[in-house]
């Protein structure tokens, strides 16, 4: 059986992958085999880190809220604050509360004082 020449199809596939990895360093952007491996590895990393980013930001927001609450009253904790928020049916998520804690602490103090009552 005669050997078939792939022509432009294989070249087009390789250039598509090469464009994806053009910003990588060294052989990771030049050699076809390592390019395909690095592309798969990069996509795996981005998929994993999208979930990790959600976790990290949630931890950051909780830390910021907790720090501001502890400044206001030492006996009041973050978990009690969130519990009281839900009891009062205030629809403020952690992201918004963290932004309030950074930009306008007095507003967060007012919210926590209203909840405590």
UniProtKB/Swiss-Prot annotation:
InterPro entries: Ribosomal_bL20, RIBOSOMAL_L20_CS, Ribosomal_protein_bL20_C. CDD domains: Ribosomal_L20. One of its GO terms (molecular function) is rRNA binding. GO terms for biological process: ribosomal large subunit assembly; translation. It holds the Pfam family Ribosomal_L20. GO terms for cellular component: chloroplast; ribonucleoprotein complex; ribosome. It is found in: Plastid, Chloroplast. Keywords: Chloroplast, Plastid, Ribonucleoprotein, Ribosomal protein, RNA-binding, rRNA-binding. Its main location: plastid. PANTHER family: 39S RIBOSOMAL PROTEIN L20 (PTHR10986). HAMAP family: Ribosomal_bL20. Binds directly to 23S ribosomal RNA and is necessary for the in vitro assembly process of the 50S ribosomal subunit. It is not involved in the protein synthesizing functions of that subunit. Belongs to the bacterial ribosomal protein bL20 family. This is Large ribosomal subunit protein bL20c. It comes from Vitis vinifera.
